[in-house]
């Protein structure tokens, strides 16, 4: 498995050779620095730790500064491990968007937009209770019954109710890479990806 850390720029659309309008997402992918190399002998597994997006030194702890100094780079805001990286890299190597090529498929992981406290109609797609007429006046978006009566005298775990929506780790799989703009470290991905603009995403292939 290989991958990069990126930042979601936003959505746009492009036209293909047949004149079809395709919605797509632009991602600033890398460059990422190898900040640590995990080995089986020391750590029990193989992985590369990549860092992305420079961090102000005054906002970093001494432990962070020492960790990134070993890799010969400044402190990074986002650090992610990629296990079983396909190609060999050493500490301090820079991995760029050239890792990807046009036409291949990638998986993208991010944190979905937070929606706050929402009801069951928006959060779970409930249809509401009853109809809008014939005396009904306050149950249009109600959840309805949440359990039985005296037996089992409780609400089962996992019952879908109102609550906080969004802000979850979401992975979208098999998204096609439409364009790779190497000189600007940009990836153009077909379709939408989780997260708001300027949020961090993990791109895997």
Swiss-Prot record:
PANTHER family reported in the protein's UniProt record: 50S RIBOSOMAL PROTEIN L3, LARGE RIBOSOMAL SUBUNIT PROTEIN UL3C
Key words, A-Z: Ribonucleoprotein, Ribosomal protein, RNA-binding, rRNA-binding
Molecular function GO labels: rRNA binding; structural constituent of ribosome
Name of the molecule in the record: Large ribosomal subunit protein uL3
Similarity remark: Belongs to the universal ribosomal protein uL3 family.
InterPro entries xrefs: Ribosomal_uL3, Ribosomal_uL3_bac/org-type, Ribosomal_uL3_CS, Transl_B-barrel_sf
Annotated coiled-coil segments of the chain: none
Function: One of the primary rRNA binding proteins, it binds directly near the 3'-end of the 23S rRNA, where it nucleates assembly of the 50S subunit.
Assembly with partners or alone: Part of the 50S ribosomal subunit. Forms a cluster with proteins L14 and L19.
A biological process from GO: translation
NCBIfam families: L3_bact
UniProt entry tagged with the keyword rRNA-binding: yes
Organism: Flavobacterium psychrophilum (strain ATCC 49511 / DSM 21280 / CIP 103535 / JIP02/86)
């Amino acid at each position: 498995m290989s991958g990069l850390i990126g930042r979601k720029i936003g959505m746009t659309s492009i036209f293909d050779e047949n004149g079809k309008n395709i919605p797509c997402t632009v991602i600033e992918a890398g460059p990422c620095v190898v900040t640590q190399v995990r080995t089986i002998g020391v750590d029990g597994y193989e992985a590369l730790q990549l860092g992305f997006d420079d961090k102000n030194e005054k906002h970093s702890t001494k432990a962070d500064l020492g960790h990134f100094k070993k890799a010969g780079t400044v402190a990074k805001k986002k650090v992610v491990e990629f296990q079983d990286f396909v190609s060999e890299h050493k500490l301090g190597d820079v991995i760029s968007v050239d890792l990807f090529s046009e036409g291949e498929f990638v998986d993208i992981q991010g944190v979905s937009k937070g929606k706050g406290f929402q009801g069951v109609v928006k959060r779970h797609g409930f249809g509401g209770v009853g109809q809008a007429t014939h005396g009904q006046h306050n149950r249009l978006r109600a959840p309805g019954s949440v359990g039985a009566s005296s037996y089992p005298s409780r609400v089962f775990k996992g019952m879908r109710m109102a609550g906080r929506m969004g802000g979850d780790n979401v992975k979208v799989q098999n998204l096609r890479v439409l364009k790779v703009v190497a000189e600007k470290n940009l990836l153009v991905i077909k379709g939408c990806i989780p997260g708001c603009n300027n949020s961090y995403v993990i791109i895997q292939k």
